[in-house]
């Protein structure tokens, strides 16, 4: 006799919610995501709860960050201000819940890993707030409430440089690269290598190789098991990539920060 399967459970702060419990809540909606990044841009329909409604039960301070942990070790860090938006003219965050009796399709790029479920953070009107692909974490297991990133991971932040390009690059790093990489051995995820120790990418990938690598990693090097996605123009403009490179270049001078 096969062992009984455990029902998927989502942790939100100190609380836990079973999938069946969430699917019965009065706030549940049927939503349509017109261009779903987890499914190759196809249109998908989900049973989902507005993040602002579910997280209203969790005490959040204005400067708190929600770290979204996924089954494969990916961790997206999303600010309270961003994930709790509820007004018109803004992107709206939803937690999509997979019904165990009506499974979603397998992920097209990772069919062996199953679907995007059991829980998936999706957005309606993502273009209104510039939502990036890394802010669509799937196979979510927990939403962890954290304080300010600067307090949690001070070595990620330049100590002296206030150049506007570096500041913009840091913000993009927080929303994208930080989901997989650490900086000076600080960060919530270790899916990818540290981006400063022992070497910073700017020290071994020179122009134009580094911007090209960020845009399309497989155009520089490719191997079985490589996980890093490319960042197309719809995610990163050429200027965005230049800003991220400026931040990385600055951090190459701040390795002593990790001592």
PLM segments and residue spans:
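Short pre-active-site segment immediately N-terminal to redox-active cysteine/selenocysteine motifs
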Residues: 50, 165, 173-179, 184, ...
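Gly/Gly-Pro-rich "capping" loops immediately C-terminal to redox-active cysteine motifs
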Residues: 182-215, 230
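The canonical Cys-X-X-Cys-His
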Residues: 169-184, 210, 228, 244-248
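Sec/Tat signal peptide C-region and signal peptidase I cleavage site
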Residues: 2-4
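Axial heme c-ligation environment in periplasmic c-type cytochrome domains
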Residues: 190-196, 216-251, 255-259
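Structured, non-membrane catalytic/scaffold regions adjacent to prosthetic-group chemistry
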Residues: 6-152, 259
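Electrostatic cytochrome c docking/interface patches
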Residues: 147-172
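Solvent-exposed, acidic/flexible segments
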Residues: 40-48, 61, 162, 166, ...
């Amino acid at each position: 006799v096969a062992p009984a399967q455990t029902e998927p459970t989502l942790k939100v702060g100190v609380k836990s919610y079973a999938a069946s419990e969430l699917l019965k809540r009065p706030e549940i909606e049927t939503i349509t995501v017109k261009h779903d990044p987890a499914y190759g841009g196809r249109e998908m329909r989900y049973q989902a709860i507005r993040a602002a409604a579910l997280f209203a039960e969790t005490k959040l301070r204005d400067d708190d960050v929600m770290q979204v942990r996924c089954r494969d070790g990916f961790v997206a860090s999303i600010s309270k201000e961003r994930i709790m938006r509820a007004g018109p003219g803004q992107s709206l965050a939803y937690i999509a819940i997979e019904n165990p009796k009506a499974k979603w399709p397998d992920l097209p790029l990772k069919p062996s890993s199953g679907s995007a479920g059991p829980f998936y953070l999706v957005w309606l009107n993502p273009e209104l707030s510039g939502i990036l692909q890394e802010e669509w974490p799937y196979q979510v297991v927990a939403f962890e409430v954290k304080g300010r990133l600067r307090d949690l991971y001070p070595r990620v932040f330049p100590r002296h440089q206030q150049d506007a390009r570096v500041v913009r690059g840091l913000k993009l790093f927080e929303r994208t690269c930080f989901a997989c990489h650490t900086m000076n051995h600080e960060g919530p995820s270790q899916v990818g290598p540290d981006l400063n120790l022992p070497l910073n990418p700017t020290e071994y990938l020179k122009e134009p190789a580094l911007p090209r690598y960020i845009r399309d990693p497989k155009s520089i090097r490719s191997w079985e098991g490589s996980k890093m996605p490319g960042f197309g123009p719809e995610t990163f403009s050429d200027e965005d990539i230049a800003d991220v490179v400026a931040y990385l270049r600055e951090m190459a001078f701040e390795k002593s920060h990790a001592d």
